[in-house]
C-alpha cells in the first residue's frame, strides 16, 4: 500500500487529504467556497508538513481532474503538478465523476446488484456534466454535458434502477420522475474519497505525464463580457 496526497478542487469545495495504506490519516476541507486560490496552498502545506512530521514519505499525488469548475480544476492541477515536480513524485489523474461515486459505493449497501450510478456536476441552467457507471465503475455511458428533460436517461431507467447524486442532481428531481430514478443527497467530490481509485491507479501504474497533463474541462472556458457602464 502507499502514502498519497489527494487534491480535489473541481467544485466550490476545496479539499486535501493524505492516505496511508488505504486509510485517510489527514484531511482539510472548506465546503463553503469557492476559496481555492486562498485555501489550497495552506491545506497542501499542512498536509505535507503532517506527512513529513510523521515519517510518511509520499508515493504519489492524486488530483481530481474534471469535469467541473474551469478555475478550480486549473488551480488544483497546477498545485498537484508543482508538488510532483518539487518532490519527484508520480501524478495520478482521477475523473471527478468517478470520485463522486466512491461514497455511494462505500456507504450505501442498499444498492441492488443491477443498479447504475449517475454522478452529476452542476453546469448551468438545466445542464449537467454526467456519466453512467455500473457498480464496478465500468462506464455504461461516457462523460457528457447533458441538458436534462423528462426523457433524459430513459434508456437506462427502463431497464435498471438508476441512482443520481452530486450537486447537479438536485435540480433534476422535478424533471426525472421515472419510478426507477433514485436520488441520493449530500454527495460531492472530496479528497478524502479519492484513495480507493488512487490505490488502484498505483497498482496498475496508471500515471500521467506531469509536463503535459491538463484537466478534463469537457467544455472550453468562455469568459463573459463585462457590462458597460452607463
Where are these predicted regions, by residue range?
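Stable alpha-helical structural segments in soluble proteins, enriched in small hydrophobic residues
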Residues: 47-51, 86, 104, 194-202
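Residues at secondary-structure transition points
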Residues: 31-39, 70, 74, 78, ...
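N-terminal beta-alpha supersecondary unit
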Residues: 1-67
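Surface "functional belts" at beta-alpha junctions
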Residues: 23-25, 35, 90-189, 217, ...
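Phosphate-handling active-site elements
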Residues: 51-58, 85-94, 110-112
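Acyltransferase
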Residues: 184-230
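DPxDG-like acidic metal-binding loop motif
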Residues: 62-96
Amino acid at each position: 500500500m502507499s502514502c498519497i496526497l489527494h487534491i480535489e478542487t473541481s467544485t466550490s469545495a476545496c479539499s486535501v487529504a493524505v492516505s496511508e495504506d488505504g486509510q485517510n490519516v489527514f484531511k482539510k476541507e472548506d465546503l463553503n467556497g469557492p476559496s481555492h486560490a486562498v485555501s489550497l496552498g495552506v491545506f497542501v502545506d499542512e498536509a505535507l508538513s503532517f506527512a513529513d512530521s510523521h515519517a510518511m514519505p509520499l508515493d504519489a499525488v492524486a488530483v481530481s481532474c474534471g469535469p467541473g469548475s474551469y478555475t478550480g480544476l486549473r488551480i488544483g492541477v497546477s498545485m498537484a503538478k508543482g508538488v510532483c515536480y518539487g518532490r519527484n513524485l508520480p501524478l495520478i489523474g482521477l475523473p471527478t465523476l468517478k470520485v463522486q461515486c466512491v461514497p455511494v459505493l462505500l456507504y450505501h449497501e442498499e444498492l441492488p446488484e443491477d443498479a447504475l450510478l449517475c454522478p452529476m456536476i452542476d453546469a448551468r441552467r438545466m445542464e449537467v456534466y454526467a456519466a453512467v457507471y455500473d457498480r464496478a465503475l465500468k462506464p455504461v455511458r461516457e462523460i457528457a454535458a447533458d441538458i436534462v428533460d423528462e426523457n433524459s436517461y430513459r434508456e437506462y431507467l427502463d431497464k435498471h434502477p438508476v441512482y443520481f447524486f452530486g450537486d447537479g442532481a438536485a435540480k433534476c428531481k422535478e424533471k426525472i420522475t421515472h419510478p426507477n430514478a433514485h436520488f441520493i443527497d449530500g454527495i460531492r467530490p472530496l479528497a478524502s474519497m479519492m484513495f480507493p481509485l488512487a490505490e488502484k491507479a498505483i497498482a496498475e501504474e496508471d500515471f500521467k505525464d506531469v509536463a503535459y497533463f491538463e484537466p478534463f474541462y469537457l467544455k472550453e472556458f468562455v469568459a463573459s463580457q463585462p457590462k458597460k457602464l452607463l
